[in-house]
A protein has these predicted regions:
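Phosphate-coordinating loops and pocket residues in cytosolic domains that bind phosphorylated ligands
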Residues: 34, 63-64
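Helix-turn-helix DNA-binding elements, focusing on the entry/boundary residues of the two helices
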Residues: 7, 18, 29, 44-47
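DNA major-groove recognition helix of helix-turn-helix
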Residues: 35-36, 54
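Short alpha-helical DNA-recognition segment
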Residues: 15-34
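The alpha-helix within a helix-turn-helix
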Residues: 11, 22, 51
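A short, Lys/Arg-rich alpha-helix, primarily the initiator
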Residues: 1-15
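DNA major-groove recognition helix of helix-turn-helix/homeodomain DNA-binding modules
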Residues: 26, 45-60
Length: 65
């Protein structure tokens, strides 16, 4: 499972909408949708923040299964 799938699972497990998640990370509205649809991925520094927020290791967030 790659970033887009794992990110969506983590976001939904917290009961967060895409818009709310954009706000949590200070992103432009629609950014989470772009990630979850696989059009792009966040920069490495932001991936670290996302992993910390969701309480997972970076490896678990970005690695393909």
């Amino acid at each position: 499972m790659g970033f887009k799938t794992r990110f969506r699972e983590l976001r939904e497990s917290r009961g967060l909408s895409q818009a709310a998640t954009d706000e949590v990370f200070g992103l432009m509205r629609g950014t989470c949708s772009i990630w979850e649809n696989g059009f792009s991925e966040p920069e490495e520094e932001l991936i670290e923040d996302i992993a910390r927020f969701f309480g997972v290791r970076i490896h678990d967030l970005v690695e393909e299964a």
